[in-house]
Amino acid sequence: MLRVAIAGASGYTGFELVRLLDRHPHAELKMITSRVHRGQRLDKVYPALRKHCDLVFEEPDPERLAAEADLVFTALPHRAAMDMIPDLLKGGAKVVDLSADYRFLDAAVYEAWYEPHKTPELLKEAVYGLPELHREEIRNARLVGNPGCYPTSVILAAAPLVAGKLADPRTLIADSKSGVSGAGRGVSLTVHFCEVNDGFKAYKVGEHRHTPEIEQELSRLAGEKLAVTFTPHLVPMSRGILSTVYATVIQGVTPEDISAAYESFYRNARFVRLCRAEMPTTLQVRGSNYCDIGWRLDSRTGRAVLIAVIDNLTRGASGQAICNMNIMCGFPEDCGLQDAPWQP
């Protein structure tokens, strides 16, 4: 049985990790940490977990975490993760990091969007944890940077078109809508009920921190440096992301060419479902690790319209983290993740 721990288990992604690990046949949760809730039982903070987990939150001590667990999920804020992860690795634990600290190939890119990086040498070995693109590298990794929620949806939507050279990658535009849980469990005016309910707004236009992740991975697929226009929006629902990606196709590309590219690219993808007849909705992936993708070619404008939906807490965070754990530890990729989505 694989021993696992969660550093920073009190947020929504921490809850989702516990919920999913509870049904995992080969992993046992041994330790959870939280400075704020230290000494409290998890099921007091999250009553939904009564009779599922009675662990008590402990102080985040990397030496103890590495001793108690073979693999640690770090569900910590940016910068806090990099304070802990080097010690976890030294202690022999594998790490799946849900912060942005180890998602980038280049420390300068991280520092341009976040803060100075304390351990840039670890970026050389960290693997970007999107299984559809980097499955073999993940298999041999001891440190995986779990992708952000928006990048997961945008990259998966655009990857076959970019990799197949069917569109001009310099024309990529991504428009994404997210549920409020993407902002985390903390209290702020931005996610106050009266500020969100009955409203729909764009935010961080032209400056969202997920932009460089999208650009990094699509640039790798394109073989050239790309700049992507990315605009996120907040919608009044609890969970879910719908991303619409636009790209101008190469002259002569047909709808059949696009369909063939998606079928080929995702032929072995356990958690990508292609919607051939209809456009996907966030409801059909709720609570699951699926990314559902639909597409159309607008022949009038020569643009491909690509639509991807995910659950931001599952495929966009904790479900993908467990999928990465499975790959790193030699388990079937869908272990603990086989449940159908919730509906309604």
Swiss-Prot record:
Cellular localisation: Cytoplasm
GO biological process per UniProt: L-arginine biosynthetic process
Molecular function terms from GO: N-acetyl-gamma-glutamyl-phosphate reductase activity; NAD binding; NADP+ binding
Assigned EC number: 1.2.1.38
Pathway where this protein functions: Amino-acid biosynthesis; L-arginine biosynthesis; N(2)-acetyl-L-ornithine from L-glutamate: step 3/4
Record's keyword annotation contains Membrane: no
Protein name: N-acetyl-gamma-glutamyl-phosphate reductase
